[in-house]
Amino acid sequence: MDKFLISGSGPLTGELRISGSKNAALPILAATILAQGKVRLANVPHLNDISTMIALLRTLGLTIEIQGDHVVIVDPNTINSYTAPYELVKTMRASILVLGPLLARYGEANVSFPGGCAIGSRPVDIHLRGLEAMGASIEIDGGYIRARRQGRLKGCHFLMDTVTVGGTENLLMAAVLAEGKTILENAAREPEIVDLANLLVAMGARISGIGTSTLTIEGVESLTGCDYSVMPDRIETGTYLVAAAASRGKVRLTHTSASILEAVIVKLQEAGADVTTGEDWIALDMNGRRPKAVSLKTAPYPAFPTDMQSQFMALNAVADGISHITETIFENRLVQVAELKRMGAHIELEHNTAIVTGVERLKAAPVMASDLRASASLVIAGLVADGETLIDRIYHIDRGYEAIEAKFQALGASVRRIKS
């Protein structure tokens, strides 16, 4: 199992190109099942989760051609199976996203219950209730969700009783081929859902209310292929900005957008960063200053994203002052606290809130990654620690960060992958 060896260094400085969004590319890849022609996707990140989704689509029979590192061409017309097997689904929760497209296009879907990060209970009951409201019959058998329809799915008015990104994506993809009008209330509003909706529109779907909490879909009989470029990764963008701020550095990130990261940028400015932006770039400069502690509370978009919480905890660990970080989305997403405390961080837990008292520097220690974003917080902590930090179980990082060691090295950091 690979590990990272990180030597604490000075401020991060330089320029980076941000990759395409993992959390947009995964549902977009699943959505290609809906098309009747080839779909050419650009700016697809080279990540383990993307490879898993491609392997899943190939298992279903889709023909996939990869051109270079970031272009994927999908021909969905060769599909010959409607079963997403446990062997693939167990490694990545986003596998559930083939459920809606398979059911809508082919009338049948057999999908194993999903896996992925161990960050709490993320039930799929809203996905299933929404599909049943569209006329699907669903049973759970042997660890599989088995969904069927007679005739086309039927448009419906469905209120999601909690905001769910995956549920919104699955029901949106099912609704585009349903008969009649579907209204999805309390829909998630994340930029990645906007990106998925824009792809579906490019394929011929009729969707209004994109970017709002009410999506209205007029079902069509078929969708075509198209060319589409995946949006930039806002969490990767935020991670490198936070790392630069924690290290008192100066960076410029290209092929990204400030408009998808407003809540994070506000907190970085609170921490003392000078942030300037352009149409496709963000620059951050700490002017050599120690960051100031910033308190935050995670909530659905457009509020502060749960996927950036752990990175800010690493920043607050070396910030001037005391901060409160409250996690409201996932119940187990403060797991990085124990590892950060091994490095000398002063953190106390009160229910779902971490109280962080900043120290001048952390101290290197062997630590273990537990999920994707907690892993990123440990990398940031290693960069602002005295000595060499060894991070185990970095396969979590490889699920969501493209070439992370090379990118940090380009900013002057000492991050080495050690093959086991």
UniProtKB/Swiss-Prot annotation:
<comment type="pathway">
    <text>Cell wall biogenesis; peptidoglycan biosynthesis.</text>
</comment>
<feature type="modified residue" description="2-(S-cysteinyl)pyruvic acid O-phosphothioketal">
    <location>
        <position position="117"/>
    </location>
</feature>
<feature type="active site" description="Proton donor">
    <location>
        <position position="117"/>
    </location>
</feature>
<feature type="binding site">
    <location>
        <begin position="22"/>
        <end position="23"/>
    </location>
    <ligand>
        <name>phosphoenolpyruvate</name>
    </ligand>
</feature>
<dbReference type="Pfam" id="PF00275">
    <property type="entry name" value="EPSP_synthase"/>
</dbReference>
<dbReference type="GO" id="GO:0008360">
    <property type="term" value="P:regulation of cell shape"/>
</dbReference>
<dbReference type="GO" id="GO:0009252">
    <property type="term" value="P:peptidoglycan biosynthetic process"/>
</dbReference>
<dbReference type="InterPro" id="IPR036968">
    <property type="entry name" value="Enolpyruvate_Tfrase_sf"/>
</dbReference>
<feature type="binding site">
    <location>
        <position position="93"/>
    </location>
    <ligand>
        <name>UDP-N-acetyl-alpha-D-glucosamine</name>
    </ligand>
</feature>
<keyword id="KW-0132">Cell division</keyword>
<keyword id="KW-0961">Cell wall biogenesis/degradation</keyword>
<dbReference type="GO" id="GO:0005737">
    <property type="term" value="C:cytoplasm"/>
</dbReference>
<keyword id="KW-0963">Cytoplasm</keyword>
<protein>
    <recommendedName>
        <fullName>UDP-N-acetylglucosamine 1-carboxyvinyltransferase</fullName>
        <ecNumber>2.5.1.7</ecNumber>
    </recommendedName>
</protein>
<dbReference type="InterPro" id="IPR013792">
    <property type="entry name" value="RNA3'P_cycl/enolpyr_Trfase_a/b"/>
</dbReference>
<comment type="function">
    <text>Cell wall formation. Adds enolpyruvyl to UDP-N-acetylglucosamine.</text>
</comment>
<dbReference type="GO" id="GO:0008760">
    <property type="term" value="F:UDP-N-acetylglucosamine 1-carboxyvinyltransferase activity"/>
</dbReference>
<dbReference type="GO" id="GO:0071555">
    <property type="term" value="P:cell wall organization"/>
</dbReference>
<dbReference type="InterPro" id="IPR005750">
    <property type="entry name" value="UDP_GlcNAc_COvinyl_MurA"/>
</dbReference>
<dbReference type="InterPro" id="IPR001986">
    <property type="entry name" value="Enolpyruvate_Tfrase_dom"/>
</dbReference>
<keyword id="KW-0808">Transferase</keyword>
<feature type="binding site">
    <location>
        <position position="329"/>
    </location>
    <ligand>
        <name>UDP-N-acetyl-alpha-D-glucosamine</name>
    </ligand>
</feature>
<feature type="binding site">
    <location>
        <position position="307"/>
    </location>
    <ligand>
        <name>UDP-N-acetyl-alpha-D-glucosamine</name>
    </ligand>
</feature>
<keyword id="KW-0573">Peptidoglycan synthesis</keyword>
<dbReference type="InterPro" id="IPR050068">
    <property type="entry name" value="MurA_subfamily"/>
</dbReference>
<keyword id="KW-0131">Cell cycle</keyword>
<keyword id="KW-0133">Cell shape</keyword>
<comment type="similarity">
    <text>Belongs to the EPSP synthase family. MurA subfamily.</text>
</comment>
<keyword id="KW-0670">Pyruvate</keyword>
<dbReference type="GO" id="GO:0051301">
    <property type="term" value="P:cell division"/>
</dbReference>
<dbReference type="GO" id="GO:0019277">
    <property type="term" value="P:UDP-N-acetylgalactosamine biosynthetic process"/>
</dbReference>
